[in-house]
Amino acid sequence: VLNARIRKAWSRGANIGLIGEAVDLTYEYTHMGNGRADLQSLLKQKFTDMLTLPSLMIVGQAALQGEDGASVLGAVMELCTKTESKLLVLHSAASRVGLMDLGCTTEGGVDAAVTGADVVYNLGVDEMDIAPGAFVIYQGSHGDRGAHRADVILPGATYTEENGLFVNTEGRPQLAQRAGFAPGQAKENWAILRALSAELGATLPYDSLAQLRQALVTDVPHFAQIDQVPSNEWVAVTAGKLGKGDFGVAISDYYLSNPIARASTLMAELSANAKARATTPMAAE
């Protein structure tokens, strides 16, 4: 969806530049390099032409996942300041921005959160390995890797089977309406957590989705600003020493990038076809 928006801007005359692996974006762009050295070189240039036009810099997860991720982000923010550009961080998980708004983060990341834990309550996280030893409770919809590691599975609705409030990659809250009902014994995810809290003797203070949303908006007021991008304070990250090497790509198989896609026969076929095209040599005309 985002790439379609970028293509639309390109069709209207926007100039696109890319630092990273050269890929087919379906539109023309200037390939400005592959990695950290090219970003460092870009910081030394002058940007007189860019100052006269509105511009946006998008930084993806492949650039931020290394040990120098904070330094890379700092360098990009410095570049934004020099060019008077806006900044957008492109996330690879649909729920990540909303969870960060809620404060669901751990110093040291996921590894710090699960290391040494006796019990892990996994809310649909499938792109990670949980070490043996912990008792795992998995709440999710499609029986992916997280469910295979679980000791207890609580089947939840997928995003099309329940009303939801999502925050997109730019921080814009969006309402999603249920398109169908969850199969079998699967329940809406908020209802699972509410029922579990009662069983544990720590009943959560809401009995309906409306009450839950009221509590949510009280804690995070901008969640009430549906379809609006909140104004964020610019807090620069110090551009530390960058490492070496190229950025690469964050998603190696587009068609199998999430649990719902991996449960799809059609997506598996598309993935296989894409791999076949990549490995089959083209005949010379």
What residue ranges belong to the model's regions?
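Non-catalytic alpha/beta scaffold blocks inside enzyme catalytic domains
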Residues: 1-226, 280-285
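Long, low-complexity segments enriched in small/aliphatic residues
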Residues: 210-285
